[in-house]
Amino acid sequence: MEMTKLSCEKFLAELASKAPTPGGGGTAALVGAAGVALGNMVGNLTTGKKKYAAVEADIQALNTRADALRKELEALVQADADAFAPLAAAYGLPKDTPEQAAHKAAVLEKALDAACAVPLEVMEKCAEGIALVEEYAAKGSVMAVSDAGCAAALCKAALQAASLNVFINTKLMADRERAAALDAKTDKLLDEFVLRADAVFASVTNKLRNK
């Protein structure tokens, strides 16, 4: 099943079902893509306007990157679903003998490590999305400033949601040194970019609520 080819209605129905995919990781990627798309919309509402001629080149560059970033996050919706199969297969391996148990442990460890890769990439893309949205909020059309704030909120939510999909896998890893390294990378992204997204949201809120 190609997740990004589903209608909104079908995707949500699948998400609500007991099917293992789509799940939190794929949804995080989709929400991140929506956040980046909103930022891109701000840019497209800004370009070509005389009032913003001084930042036209900047906005055009932002739009080019935002368009590519959205597509990268869309691809990660499917990548997350694809990554679940090896993990599920690993959990299903027999462990009746010492040899089987050792084999299962090795395969599961590898699958858990691999399962962290997609949500970490989602986080990295969402972090980049937040950086783009900072510029859209600062340079984009004031008529679309609320959309820039929404974009920041969505990218932040996706970043945080993806982090949980890292932590659920690192918690189960036998190699605690490797798990700690992945957790540290995740924490670093959270520590920096949650604050940056919050700053954009606060700035936009201030503009909307104060004359």
Q: For the regions a protein language model found, what residue spans apply to each?
A:
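Polytopic transmembrane helical bundles with strong interfacial aromatic enrichment
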Residues: M3-L6, E121, I168-N169, A197
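Short, hydrophobic/aliphatic alpha-helical segments
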Residues: M3-T21
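Conserved phosphate/anionic-ligand binding catalytic regions in large, soluble enzymes, centered on
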Residues: S17-L38, A144-A162
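Phosphate-handling active-site elements
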Residues: L38-D58
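A structural-propensity feature for long, helix-poor, extended segments
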Residues: K51-A89, L189
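Long, charge-rich low-complexity segments
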Residues: A79-P94, A197-K211
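Amphipathic alpha-helical interface segments
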Residues: D80, F84-A153, A157, N169
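Preference for long, well-ordered alpha-helical segments
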Residues: G129-L132, A144-V204
